[in-house]
Each structure stands twice: as C-alpha cells, then as structure tokens.
C-alpha cells in the first residue's frame, strides 16, 4: 500500500471515529463507499447511519440552534481565517469543531436541553460558508456576529437578542 493510500485510510478512521457520515468521509478521502462501510462496521460494530445530510436552513431552524451554529462558525473562522469563505479546509473544520465542543462543555450544563451541533451539521455549515449559502450577519443591537442562511427557515434577526428577550 502506498503512503498516500495509508494516509487516506487513516484519515477515514479518524473521521469515522469523530462521527462524520460516510458520504462526507468518502468525499474527503476519495475512498470507495464499500470500503468505508466495511471500515465503519469494523470500528463501530454496527452498520453506518443512512439518509440525507441536514441542510443549512434546517440546522439554523430555531433561535437556539442558530445561536449554537453561530458559536461553531465563529470558532471555525477563528481556526481557518478568511480562507473558510473560499474553501472548506478539514484541519480548520476539525480544530474549530473541537474548540466549539470545549466551549459548550465549559458553559452548558450536561443536562441542558439545548442540542449540541453535531459534526455533520458543522461540516454542512463549513461547506455552505465556502459557497456563500450561509453568511455572517452583525447584529445592530448587540454587535454579535451570527450565522444566517440565504434560504432561511428561522425568523430574521439576531438569535442572541431574541433568546435574551425570551428569557427576561
């Protein structure tokens, strides 16, 4: 086996261990779906999940989800710089997602009802930041930058201000 093939295989093992869907792992590594399914079963002891990936507008559908996604996107921008608007870079995605998880663990109680963004949704957002399907918007009231989708399901406006208003 060539060094490049070993590297792609090791990357696939890491990404599957992190919970990335096989369609994404295949896209990133170029490995055949059958190889990835076999690898997934060997690593996880079960068949891989199936079904479509979420859309960015679905990920941003509620104010809380939009706020959580915005925290991830800000972490991703911090690790990837301005280049995230041109292309998705795997190291920046993984580093940004790890930072996001650290922040969530530090500030949200374990029994919190708020759903933590999973890595597949994070990948969708990173991909869509590169294509312009999602973008940052700065709030005119609190100055926080939050994530919006061009095809939005969530109401317009800042999710942080909306959540603060709701909790008063």
Identify the role of each PLM range.
Residues 1-14, 18, 22-168:
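Long, charge-rich, low-complexity intrinsically disordered regions
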């Amino acid at each position: 086996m060539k060094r490049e093939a070993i590297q792609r295989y090791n990357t696939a093992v890491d990404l599957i261990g992190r919970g990335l869907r096989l369609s994404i792992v295949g896209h990133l590594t170029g490995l055949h779906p059958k190889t990835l399914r076999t690898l997934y079963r060997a690593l996880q002891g079960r068949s891989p999940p199936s079904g479509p990936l979420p859309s960015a507008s679905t990920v941003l559908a509620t104010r809380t989800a939009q706020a959580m996604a915005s925290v991830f996107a800000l972490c991703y921008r911090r690790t990837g710089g301005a280049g995230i608007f041109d292309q998705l870079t795997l190291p920046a995605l993984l580093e940004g997602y790890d930072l996001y998880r650290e922040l969530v663990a530090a500030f949200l109680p374990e029994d919190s009802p708020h759903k933590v963004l999973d890595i597949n949704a994070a990948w969708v957002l990173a991909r869509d930041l590169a294509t312009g399907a999602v973008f940052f918007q700065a709030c005119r009231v609190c100055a926080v930058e939050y994530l919006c989708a061009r095809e939005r399901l969530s109401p317009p406006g800042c999710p942080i201000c909306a959540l603060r208003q709701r909790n008063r």
